[in-house]
């Protein structure tokens, strides 16, 4: 499981078990205490050149795309390009953009076949040409058991991929065709309108054949503007320019710094203090870890630091309470639980308005097509009314033992107690949480605190993982163990829709339909805050993906 609050990988799995801010306090902070976006704004004040340092608590950064869960705009995107990518700009929603491909794909066969053409003049860092065969090899190697752990949407979508074990034994996928060096064709098992977003994921980075899966993570062949220069285990990683990358083929990556230095294993509190002090080389640095609630209070009291804090305008990842519908089968009891929860108390537990916003929908802010509604506002009297005459056994509330998760669990438990319910909170190690909520049979818990960050900006990435019956057990994230054949069918219909606007309407309707059965209570949208030095420009955070884009950050011209 990835670290809960660093941007090096920035994936939904960073929030799967509900881990959250370190050094958490119940301190309530006012949203006006810091800028909603960094004062750096866009990259107009940045210049080419210099070194940009990234302070991170991570002790390593993996550069093998097959094993990565990263979003396109973070560290992996500096070294590896994909067929498509994300375009981010201050104050604007994320857009899909061509990367190695000339466009975002052409669908045929009613959405079951997708064709991409590569741009001309693409080269690896060793000077060799990038071809469609390298994209195919990159995708195929993601199926190898030795390279597990990366995003795997494509594995269930490509036709004939079931049981495939990768290319290293000589086997290849017939569902990926490369009729020439610049064309790649994907044949899917079913129509999937979000496929252009899927090919922006790490597995669709080109990898030359002959790679060594055991060492590629630390010695990759780059297709992006940077390549690894120095790798010091547990200490630092330095990136230098890839001389064979051409900005003429890449409209997304500004590639401003001459070098990037990843300073590994840094204590988060110490890093924040260094950035607040803003002296020496730290002026040209930023933190990959989210600023904790306690440190947000300190930043808010420091005008200089406050001007260098970037916070997602609206909340990002969803913190939620899953109700195990197999054990809490009475929908009115579930509605009572939803009305009983005081979300303001949950927000306070996460650090106040700078740390979170109260949630009411499953689709998170910044996702296209999201429609706001609130079926279950806090109403203790309504909760008690719904529970009248019912005998509800003591409820087991499962949570991981992270500070934020426990704080949310305490807030939820107190709310339910005030409604007349008996709740036992069980904090466990993250791996134990996964075993019980994700891999077990659901018999050991009634409620579970968790978080979810969608892998890409489509409501499918909010809804399907949490509510499809296929995601119950076996490592899935349907912690509510919710199974509804009509919902499964509606998910499949929305996924197959090639009309993005029409699909968005389907997802919004499905969001509300599921909420009527209350398998999950949305608690809060987590707001992410990141701090940077005064010499850093182009640093901003939007509601989605709620992380800074490494592709446009540079050193200021001052």
Task: For the regions a language model picked out, list residue spans one by one.
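Structural transition elements
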Residues: 352-387, 402-407
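N-terminal lobe/hinge region of extracytoplasmic solute-binding protein
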Residues: 55-109, 221
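Extracellular/periplasmic solute-recognition and catalytic clefts
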Residues: 149, 229-240, 261-325
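Aromatic- and charge-enriched surface segment that lines or borders ligand/interaction sites
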Residues: 103-154, 185, 277, 329
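Gly/Pro-rich hinge or "lid" segments in bacterial periplasmic/extracellular proteins
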Residues: 88-89, 171, 182, 187-254, ...
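Periplasmic binding protein-like
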Residues: 54, 127, 275, 279-281, ...
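Long beta-strand-rich cores associated with HINT superfamily self-processing modules
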Residues: 530-558
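Alpha-helical secondary-structure segments
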Residues: 130-140, 181-188, 224-225, 255-259, ...
């Amino acid at each position: 499981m990835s670290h809960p609050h660093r941007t090096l990988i920035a994936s939904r799995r960073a929030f799967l078990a509900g881990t959250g801010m370190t050094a958490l306090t119940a301190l309530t902070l006012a949203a006006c205490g810091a800028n909603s976006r960094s004062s750096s704004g866009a990259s107009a004040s940045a210049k080419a050149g210099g070194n940009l340092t990234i302070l991170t608590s991570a002790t390593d950064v993996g550069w093998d795309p097959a094993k990565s869960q990263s979003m396109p705009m973070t560290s992996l995107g500096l070294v590896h390009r994909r067929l498509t990518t994300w375009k981010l700009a201050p104050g604007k929603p994320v857009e899909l953009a061509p990367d190695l491909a000339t466009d975002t794909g052409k669908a045929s066969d009613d959405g079951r076949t997708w064709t991409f053409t590569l741009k001309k003049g693409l080269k690896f860092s060793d000077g060799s040409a990038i071809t469609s065969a390298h994209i195919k090899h990159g995708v195929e190697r993601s199926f190898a058991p030795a390279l597990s752990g990366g995003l795997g949407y494509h594995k269930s979508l490509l036709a004939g991929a079931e049981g495939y074990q990768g290319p290293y034994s000589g086997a290849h996928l017939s569902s990926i065709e490369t009729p020439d060096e610049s064309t790649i064709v994907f044949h899917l098992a079913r129509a999937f309108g979000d496929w252009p977003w899927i090919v922006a994921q790490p597995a669709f980075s080109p990898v030359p054949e002959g790679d060594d899966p055991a060492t590629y993570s630390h010695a990759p062949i780059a297709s992006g503007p940077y390549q690894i220069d120095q790798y010091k285990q547990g200490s630092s990683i330095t990136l230098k320019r890839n001389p064979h990358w051409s900005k003429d083929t890449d409209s997304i990556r500004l590639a401003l710094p001459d070098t990037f230095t990843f300073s590994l294993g840094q204590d988060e509190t110490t890093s924040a203090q260094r950035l607040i002090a803003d002296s020496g080389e730290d002026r040209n640095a930023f933190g990959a870890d989210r600023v904790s609630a306690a440190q947000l209070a300190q930043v808010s009291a420091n005008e200089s630091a406050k001007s260098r804090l970037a916070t997602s305008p609206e909340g990002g990842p969803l913190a939620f309470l899953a109700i195990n519908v197999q054990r809490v089968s009475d929908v009115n009891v579930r509605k009572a639980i939803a009305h009983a929860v005081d979300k303001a108390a949950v927000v306070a537990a996460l650090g106040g308005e700078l740390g979170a916003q109260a949630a009411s929908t499953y689709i998170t802010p910044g996702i296209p097509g999201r429609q706001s509604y609130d079926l279950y506002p806090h109403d203790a009297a309504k909760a008690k009314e719904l529970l009248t005459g019912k005998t509800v056994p003591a409820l087991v509330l499962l949570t991981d033992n992270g500070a934020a998760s426990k704080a949310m669990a305490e807030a939820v438990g107190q709310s339910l107690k005030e409604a007349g319910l008996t709740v036992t909170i069980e904090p466990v190690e993250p791996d134990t949480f996964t075993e019980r909520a994700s891999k077990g049979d659901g018999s050991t818990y009634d409620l579970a605190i968790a978080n979810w960050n969608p892998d890409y900006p489509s409501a499918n990435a909010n809804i399907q993982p949490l509510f499809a019956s296929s995601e119950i057990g076996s490592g899935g994230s349907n912690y509510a163990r919710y199974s509804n054949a009509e919902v499964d069918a509606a998910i499949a219909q929305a996924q197959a829709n090639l009309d993005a606007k029409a699909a968005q309407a389907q997802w919004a309707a499905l969001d509300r339909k599921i909420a009527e059965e209350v398998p999950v209570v949305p608690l809060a949208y987590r707001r992410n805050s990141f701090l940077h030095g005064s010499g850093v420009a182009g640093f901003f955070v939007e509601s989605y993906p709620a992380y800074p884009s490494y592709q446009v950050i540079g050193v200021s011209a001052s």
